[in-house]
Amino acid sequence: AESSAMKFQRQHMDSDGHPDTNTNYCNEMMVRRSMTQGRCKPVNTFVHEPLEAVQAVCSQKNVPCKNGQTNCYQSHSSMRITDCRVTSSSKYPNCSYRMTQAQKSIIVACEGTPSVPVHFDATV
């Protein structure tokens, strides 16, 4: 089975991604990373930074998670991200997404020893 840490990497890490050169980035990546199976995942964020940089967030600023849990951490620096959001006209199985690129601080939930990201909580 896929671990929470591996699922996080599949759903959120694209260190070498260059969405700026590809208008179909979200449509292609959401399929490639298996987020359009059974339904179209409504929203997903990809992070274009080295995995080590994202894993390091687990030792940065401790903040409350959206669900009230206390194991979330906010990155000190802003990171290159791409938000993929399903379009209103999108109909499964033909999932269609619009993309927004940004530089934002990320908030992730971390678990384990060593502590690694297992859930993408928010961007600020």
UniProtKB/Swiss-Prot annotation:
Disulfide bonds join 26-84, 40-95, 58-110, 65-72. The keyword Phosphoprotein does not apply. Pancreas. It is an enzyme of class 4 (lyase). Pfam families: RnaseA. Residues 1-21 are annotated as: Disordered. One of its GO terms (molecular function) is ribonuclease A activity. Monomer. Interacts with and forms tight 1:1 complexes with RNH1. Dimerization of two such complexes may occur. Interaction with RNH1 inhibits this protein. Endonuclease that catalyzes the cleavage of RNA on the 3' side of pyrimidine nucleotides. Acts on single-stranded and double-stranded RNA. This is Ribonuclease pancreatic. It comes from Galea musteloides. The gene is RNASE1.
